[in-house]
Amino acid sequence: MGARLGRRARADAPAAPSAGPAPYERRVRWLREIQSTLRERRPERARQLLRLLRQDLGLEGNLLTDILHRNVTFLNLVDPISHDLLVNLARDLQCPKKDHELWKSSDKICRQLIYHLTPHSKRKHHRKTQSSLKSSLQKTLLVGETVDLSGIPLSARDVQHISRYLDTRGVELVVLDLSFTELSDELLHLLLPSLWALPRLTQLLLNGNRLTRAAARELTEAIKDTAKFPVLAWVDLGNNVDVSSLPQPLLVGLRRRLSQHTSLPTIYEGLDLEPGGGMAETTAAVSTWGSAATEAGPEPQGCCAR
C-alpha cells in the first residue's frame, strides 16, 4: 500500500519540482537586473547581462555586428518578437542616445520583453489553478474550439486526464494552448499520441515550458507520418530550454499539411537542430506574433552616429 501511495504522490506532483525555476523565470530575472543596472548608470554590466540573455535564447554573438549580420534572419526564428526586441535593446545599449534617454527607451524594451516572455492574460491577472484545468476538461467542444490550459502547472496525472479528454472529446479541437504549464519532454511524450490523432488541430502552443531539442526531434519524427497531425499548421516552441529554431524537417512537414500556402520561407542557417536542417519560420504563425516580417531587411550597420 505504501508503494501505491508513493506512486500516486509522484503522479500528482508538479512535472519537475527539482529542476529549479523555469527557463523564462531566469530570463526575466536577467531583464529586471538590466533595468536596475541602467538606473544605476552601469551600462557595461547591462550589456554583459544582455549577452547572457541572448545566448540563453539562442541568439548568439557578443557584439551588435554579430547579432545583426550573422543573425539577420532573426525574424525567421521560433520567437521573432523576442529576437526583434533583443536586437533593439542591444542597439540601445551599444549606440546610446542622450544619457537621460538611454534608461527610458531601454527600460521600455525590457518591460515589453518581460511581458512577452511570461504568462499573461488580458482577462485574468491571477495564476490559474487546478480548478481551471478541471473546468476546462469538463466542457463539450464546439466546432473550431480552442482549449486554453496556459499557466496551469501540469503533473503526470494531469497529462493523463488531458489525454483521456482529447481521446473522447477532442474531435472539434482546433487550437490547444499548453504554454507555461511546466511541460517537460517526458510529459509531452505521454501526450503526443493523443495530440497527433486530433483531426482538426491546426495550432499547438508549447512555449514557455521545459522542452528541449529532444522534444523538437520527437515532433519532427511524428510530422513525417502524414497520418499524424493531419492539418497541423503551426507549433510554437519558443521560450523553452534550448529550442531557438524549428528543425527544417519539422517545418517541411508542416508545409506539406498546408500545400495551399506556397510562400512559407525555408531559410537555411548554420545553427540548425538536425543535420542538414536549418532555422526557418512560417508566415502562418500564431496571430499573437502580430505582423512580424517574413523577410529580413537589409543588414543594419554595427553602430550609428547619434
Swiss-Prot record:
Region described as Disordered: 1-22
Which domain of life does this protein belong to?
Eukaryota
The record's induction entry says:
Markedly decreased during differentiation.
Biased-composition ranges, Low complexity, are: 12-22
Is Membrane included in the keywords of this UniProt record?
Answer: no
Q: Which InterPro entries match?
A: LRR_dom_sf (IPR032675)
User: Which residue intervals correspond to the LRR repeats?
Assistant: 173-186, 198-211
Asked if Cell inner membrane is a keyword of the record, the answer is no
List the keywords (alphabetical).
Leucine-rich repeat, Repeat
Family membership noted in the UniProt record: Belongs to the LRRC75 family.
Q: What does this protein do?
A: May suppress myogenic differentiation by modulating MYOG expression and Erk1/2 signaling.
PANTHER family cross-referenced by the UniProt entry: LEUCINE-RICH REPEAT-CONTAINING PROTEIN 75A-LIKE ISOFORM X1, LEUCINE-RICH REPEAT-CONTAINING PROTEIN 75B
- The protein's name is Leucine-rich repeat-containing protein 75B
